[in-house]
Each structure stands twice: as C-alpha cells, then as structure tokens.
Amino acid sequence: MGVTLTLPTTIRVAWSGAKLALPFSRRGVALESCSAFYLPRLIGLSKAMHIATTGATYRADDPLVSDLFSKLLPTPEETVKYALEVAQDIAENTSAVSTQINRDLMVYCPPTPEETHLLESKAFLHLVGTEDNTEGVKSFMEKRKAEFKGVMKVEDFPFWPWWDSKGVSKPKL
C-alpha cells in the first residue's frame, strides 16, 4: 500500500525502519489520493515540496517524513501490537460520535480562529446532553468504564457536514 492512502487516516504509526516514497515526479505523474491536500497540512509545505519534488525514498524516522506518524516503533512486530492496542482502546473507551465530530473539526477546520470557535461551540452544544455525553460524565463520576452507544446520524447534526463537498453527496452513515 502506498503512503498516500494513509494520509487521511486519523492515526498513523510506523516501524522506524519502514521505507516510504512519493515517487510521482520520478514517474511523470501528479500526486494522488488527496496527498496534495493532506501532506502539507501534516508536515508543512517546505517538507512536502521537498518530498514531492525529489520523489526519493525515505525511512520513516527521517526528519523529512517522521511527522507523518504519531508514533514510530523499533520493530514491525511492536508496530502491529501497538496499532492493535490503540484501536482496541479507541473502540472500548471513546464515543464514536464525539470522535467523528472532533476529527472533522480538525480536518475541515474553518479558516479563522473566530469561525472555528463558533463551529466548535455549535458542535459542543449539540453534544451536551446526548446519551454518550451523559454516559461519559456518569461513568467518570462513578469511576467505571463508559459504555458508549451513540451513532453518528446526519439528522442529529443539522450543521454536519459544514464543509463544501464540491459535488460529493452527503455521507450515508
């Protein structure tokens, strides 16, 4: 699998010795899979331009690409083990609705702090008092594990999605 397919993911971990490249300039083609959108946002324009222009191969721990990953691990086995642990933790301990809204707030963030504040406030107020919010607070107060059951439904969030999808239909969740 190419690294460009991982760029939109919420969490990326890698073995520090893994090799990756965006070889498009060496193949005479353009970037793909929204990498022109995600890459500069993840590692900065200067590093993204360097990587895309050279088309070279890098180790995951190279300073040019290491910021693509939230964590680098010393062996492939430890990488898989860690990734599964993180996935299990998310599945067992987080609200899917809250996680989706938080991800979308960061990925589709408005261009100014003021607009972002207004959108975050709207999302926050829509989540306050939901079944997942009530369960999250109650489980915290009772010092027990939360049992989140919420499902992301467009009708529950009339402002979602707030970004212009440019001809793409609303997601069916």
Give residue ranges: language-model regions.
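C-terminal long alpha-helix characteristic of the crotonase
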Residues: V13-A18, A60, F69-L119, L125-E135, ...
